[in-house]
Amino acid sequence: MPVILDGKRLSEALQAKIAMAFSAYRGPKPILGILQVGNKEDSNIYVAHKLKVAESLGFLTKLVKMPENSTQDEIIGTLRNAAAEVTGIIVQLPLVSNRIENLQEILDNIPIEKDIDGLSSYNLASNYNCKDNFLSATPKGIILLLKHYNINFRSTVIALVGQSNIVGKPLAKYLSNFKNNTIKTYVKDTPKDDLHEAKIVIVATGVYQSVTADQLANGTVLIDVGIHRQGKTIHGDLDFASCFKKASYITPVPGGVGPLTVVALMFNLIKALILQNPNLDHEFLSLKEFINI
C-alpha cells in the first residue's frame, strides 16, 4: 500500500518547532512583507494564508496591495520602499497588470538578503550551496517532505516535469548538488519515454494529466505540485486514483506540497533575519537543519 505524504501534518509539526524556538526569543521579530498587484481571488486566498501562518507564529506582517494595471515603475518604487521596512519580502504572482514590461526586473529589485521566495536573478543563478542563497519556497517544501519521510534524494534518478523558475529550475539545480543523482528534466509537452527510469517523479506543469500512470514504474515516489479547482473539486497535475496504484509514496492534493510551501517560506524568513543579524544565529540552532536547506 503506498504511503500518503501528509504535508499538512508535517507543516503543523514544523510550525510547532518554530513556535518553540521563538518562545524564549527576545530579539527583533521577523517581518514578512508581501507585495500584491490587483485583486485576483486565488492570490487573495494565498496571501491571506501566508499572513495567517506568519502571525500565528508571532511574526509581524506588512501587506502592500497595489491597484490593477499599476506601471512597472510604480511597482518597483513601491517594492523598494516596502522592502526597506521588512525582514523578507515576496512579490505575489501573478501581478495583475498589462503595463509590466519585464517581470524579472521587478523581482531583481528585491534585496538579495530579503529575497525569501528566491526569485531574483541572483538566487536563480545560484546552486543553492551558499549561506546567503534562498531556495524557492515550493522546492524547499518538497525537500522538507522527502527528508521527513527518509526518502533518498541524494543518490537516485529524479525526474522533474515542468521547468518554471518557481519550481522546476531551482529544484533541478539544488538536486544537482548531490553528485550521485541523475536528474531528468522535461517540459510539459516533451516526450517522456524514459520517465519509467525515475525513482522520484516531481510534476509541476500546471496541466492536468501531464504525466499518466502508464508512463511510471511500479514503486515510484510521486510528488504532485499542481493544483486545479473544478467546481467544488480540487486535484493536482496527476490523476491520483490511477497513479496511486503505481506509487510507493504519493502526495495528495490538497494537503501535500502546498502546506509545506508556506512553512518553507517561514524558514526562509528566519534565515533572512539571521543574515541581517548574524549575532542571532545561536538563537535558532534547533531550526538549523530546516533553515539551511
From Swiss-Prot:
One record GO biological process: L-histidine biosynthetic process
Keywords from the UniProt entry: Amino-acid biosynthesis, Histidine biosynthesis, Hydrolase, Methionine biosynthesis, Multifunctional enzyme, NADP, One-carbon metabolism, Oxidoreductase, Purine biosynthesis
SUPFAM superfamilies for the chain: Aminoacid dehydrogenase-like, N-terminal domain, NAD(P)-binding Rossmann-fold domains
Binding site for NADP(+): G162, Q163, S164, I227
GO molecular function ontology, one term from the record: methenyltetrahydrofolate cyclohydrolase activity
Source taxon at top rank: Bacteria
PANTHER family: C-1-TETRAHYDROFOLATE SYNTHASE, CYTOPLASMIC, C-1-TETRAHYDROFOLATE SYNTHASE, CYTOPLASMIC-RELATED
Reported function: Catalyzes the oxidation of 5,10-methylenetetrahydrofolate to 5,10-methenyltetrahydrofolate and then the hydrolysis of 5,10-methenyltetrahydrofolate to 10-formyltetrahydrofolate.
Assembly notes: Homodimer.
Name listed for the protein in its UniProt record: Bifunctional protein FolD
Organism of provenance: Metamycoplasma arthritidis (strain 158L3-1) (Mycoplasma arthritidis)
Gene field: folD
